[in-house]
Amino acid sequence: MEMKQISETTLKITISMDDLEERGMELKDFLIPQEKTEEFFYTVMDELDLPDNFKDSGMLSFRVTPRKDRLDVFVTKSDLNKEINFDDLADLGDVSQMTPEDFFKTIEKSMIEKGDVNAHEKLEKIEEMMEEAVDAVMTQNAEEQKEEESPFEPLDYVHYVLDFMTIQDAITFSKTVTFPIEASELYKSSDRYHMTILLDIQNQPSYYANVMYARLIEHALPGSKTRAYLQEHAHQLLEDHAVTELQKVELV
């Protein structure tokens, strides 16, 4: 793994495929955020020698960019939550209709009314941190633009959920699949079966995803639940290679 500080508030961590494999992770684990992914990020952070200003950060956000031979993780820190009680924002009215200037004036007035004698200094610091956050985003975008100009393009995946009324329907569907599938899972809910399908559409024409979806629903129903819902509320029957496993089943 390699770490590079690209601004005062942003780190770039490059993780090789070997690093992922050693930690029991795959690229598909990062397509849908889950607890396993978050734990992996913080484990990596613990292993690296972080700059001092990141070790006691109020908040950390992670942005993942898959590459052909690695994973780029941009880590952005913010101490904003240490400077202001966000519960107080409920008293400010509809902040979505305020200009930035009106927003800061309203916060300042609220803080002064509550006896905060250091309101001016705190607001100046908040504004400074917000400017740093904007700068970090611009720096990150510039960094990604450079990456896009490199010969390695990001992997591109499409994810589907399909429904089946019976397990026999799911088996029949699996036997019609003659194209590569990156991953597939089988779930059981109270009234039907559900299958998740992950396709790699890298280097495919723009219409490829739509064509593949049309092929999938020739022998399946459009999904009625999301994968996140199934992970939380349904029972997982097969993991990762559901289609391959069901293809082995002989229907009588």
UniProtKB/Swiss-Prot annotation:
Domain of life the protein comes from: Bacteria
Matching InterPro entries: MecA_C_sf, Neg-reg_MecA
Molecular-function GO term, any one: protein-macromolecule adaptor activity
Coiled coil: none
Domain notes: The N-terminal domain probably binds unfolded/aggregated proteins; the C-terminal domain interacts with ClpC.
NCBIfam families cross-referenced by the UniProt entry: PRK02315.1-4
HAMAP family: MecA (MF_01124)
Stated family: Belongs to the MecA family.
Identification of the protein by name: Adapter protein MecA
Origin species: Streptococcus uberis (strain ATCC BAA-854 / 0140J)
Classification of source organism: Bacteria, Bacillati, Bacillota, Bacilli, Lactobacillales
Gene from which this protein is expressed: mecA
